[in-house]
Amino acid sequence: MERALCEVARGGPHHLLSVRWPSGDLREMRARAVVEVARKVAEHKSLPRGLVQAALHGGRQASHAWEQAVANVPAGAAELAQALEASQATGKPASIIAFSLGCRVVLYAIAAGVIAPGSVERLVFAASAAPASDFEVLPGMLEGGTSVVHVFSKKDAVLDRLYPLGERKTRPSGRRALEIPGVENVEVDVGHRGYASIAARLWDLAVAPGEG
């Protein structure tokens, strides 16, 4: 995702910060789960038994990976603060594109005051793995003049299948529109991995209001 965004942003008049938190990438969790299923099936030489064992082990593994990712969010916000400070030296207007669990990092940074209202021109949240309630920090940013875009897809099966069981009551916002006045909702027709294929569109949303 970062590579695709860097390609479309290279040499532009805008400074783009892309935020993805790799310690808990949902697609990587899914890949590990697939490997675990294959290993357990081979170990037990039985598809039904292997699937049961893989489900038990995979559930614990995914839960641990998620907890680790969430625990690392403050560290991600600190890194983002440094990147924002460095971006000021470029003299270019800055925007942030947050992807998947990276949305939690940006929302945490806003709540902590790391991203002040008006300090960035636009915030684009794509394939958000954060619940809608986390976005309650946005009104202050909107009032400060920062534009906010929420990009979602009803076809994002990764968000639907891998969101932690303990958070089923608060579904990830990346599957539906965000109901916050002033937030621009954009629906796309891609899965979680497919967001890299629309990097140019995400870039347009980050720098050209009304033209995405």
Whereabouts are the PLM-identified features?
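Lipolytic serine-hydrolase domain surface
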Residues: 1-78, 85-87, 92, 112-122, ...
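Gly/Ala-rich beta-loop-alpha elbow adjacent to hydrolase catalytic centers
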Residues: 96-102, 106
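Aromatic pocket-lining residues of Rossmann-like dinucleotide-binding sites
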Residues: 109
